[in-house]
Every structure is written in structure tokens, then in C-alpha cells.
């Protein structure tokens, strides 16, 4: 969830309004209600397989997977291992998939205010969405950093280096999804 509140559950469930930074999955074929609350509710939604069809309840099916609803206050953050001791390691929350194989996997990445560094990716399809904070990112490989607000998106394919800066007063969180590896390199803070 990027802004506002979202409820995603079966039709008989008690409302559970999840704030920005929350994460949920919804199995294909399951009857569910997705609702938002707030004047500017924005969510990033990934569809695993197209087409995504809204169908009547009598066509529901069980694909064997189960829904996951994780409120932002219950996200489990950990330091990313393998980062040089001189660097501030990113805080990550592994959300889906296995980052050790070549299948798509997603995670949240948290960087402190003042962070400057690189996000290095090598997957065939690399996506990132700003969830909170203000990220500086050069457009089309240029030198000028452009401000990306929550809801902004950047992507690449193959080997790529994304220069990032968390220049606002608050920490920055991005959601990343790739079918390759993700590495981080820090640069000295400009604050």
C-alpha cells in the first residue's frame, strides 16, 4: 500500500484496514473484497498471470495458495547480509519468492534519510516502486537526479546500476521485484 488504507479479505471477514507500507497477496480464483479508505488511496498491484478477470463467486476455485495480509507495523525487517562493514546495510523485508533462485521475488528495502548509493540488478525484469519517502533517481541514465514521490516506478532489464538518494527528512522504502540478484553499494552521505 502506498497511501490511504486497504482492506483485502474474504467477504465475511472483519475489516482490517492496513496503512501505507502494508503488503498482501490474493490467490487467483478466490472470492474476496478489496476496498480502500481515504481520499488519496494508492496501491501497487502485481498480476502474476494475465488476464486478470473479475468473475462471479460461483466460478471461484482454489489454486492451493493462501492469502497473506501483513500490516506495515508487522513487517519483519532485517539487515541485508554481505554488505561491507564500512557501509550502512539496507534493512530488507523478504515478501515473496526466493532471492536465491531465478524465479521472481519481491522485497521491501528501507534506507535512512541522507542515504546515497546504488541499487545493482541483473534480472531480465527488474522493477521498483517508491512506497515512502523521496527518492532521487536519474532519468534515462542522466546525471540530474529527479525526485520520485511515493507511487513512482523505475525499471530495467539485464545488468543495471540505479543511483539512488534518500534526500528527504524521512527514511525511504521501495518495493523491488526481480528474477535476478540485487546488490547495494553506499556512497558517503551528502548531509
Describe each PLM feature range:
Residues 53-103, 189-191:
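A short, N-terminal "cap"/entry segment at the start of jelly-roll beta-barrel domains
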Residues 11-14, 23-25, 38-42, 51-53, ...:
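Histidine-/acidic-rich catalytic cores in large beta-rich domains
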Residues 36, 100-103, 118-126, 165-168:
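Short, low-complexity cationic-aromatic patches
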Residues 5-29, 98, 139-160:
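Short acidic-glycine-tyrosine-enriched beta hairpin
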Residues 104-108:
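Intrinsic, low-complexity N-terminal interaction/targeting segments
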Residues 11-12, 36-37, 55-58, 120-122, ...:
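Short, solvent-exposed loop/turn and secondary-structure capping segments
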Amino acid at each position: 500500500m502506498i497511501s490511504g488504507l486497504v482492506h483485502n479479505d474474504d467477504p465475511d471477514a472483519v475489516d482490517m484496514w492496513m496503512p501505507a507500507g502494508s503488503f498482501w497477496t490474493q490467490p487467483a480464483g478466490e472470492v474476496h473484497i478489496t476496498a480502500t479508505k481515504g481520499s488519496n488511496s494508492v496501491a501497487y498491484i502485481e498480476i502474476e498471470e494475465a488476464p486478470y478477470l473479475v468473475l462471479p463467486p460461483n466460478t471461484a476455485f482454489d489454486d492451493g495458495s493462501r492469502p497473506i495480509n501483513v500490516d506495515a507495523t508487522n513487517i519483519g525487517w532485517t539487515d541485508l547480509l554481505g554488505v561491507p562493514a564500512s557501509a550502512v546495510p539496507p534493512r530488507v523485508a523478504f515478501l515473496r519468492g526466493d532471492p536465491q533462485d531465478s524465479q521472481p521475488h519481491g522485497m521491501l528495502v528501507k534506507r535512512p534519510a541522507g542515504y546515497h548509493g546504488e541499487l545493482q540488478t541483473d534480472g531480465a525484469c527488474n522493477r521498483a516502486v517508491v512506497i515512502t519517502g523521496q527518492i532521487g533517481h536519474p532519468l534515462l541514465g542522466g546525471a540530474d537526479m529527479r525526485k520520485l514521490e511515493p507511487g513512482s516506478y523505475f525499471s530495467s532489464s539485464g545488468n543495471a546500476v540505479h543511483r539512488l538518494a534518500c534526500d528527504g527528512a524521512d527514511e525511504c522504502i521501495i518495493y523491488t521485484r526481480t528474477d535476478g540478484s540485487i546488490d547495494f553499494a553506499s556512497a558517503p552521505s551528502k548531509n
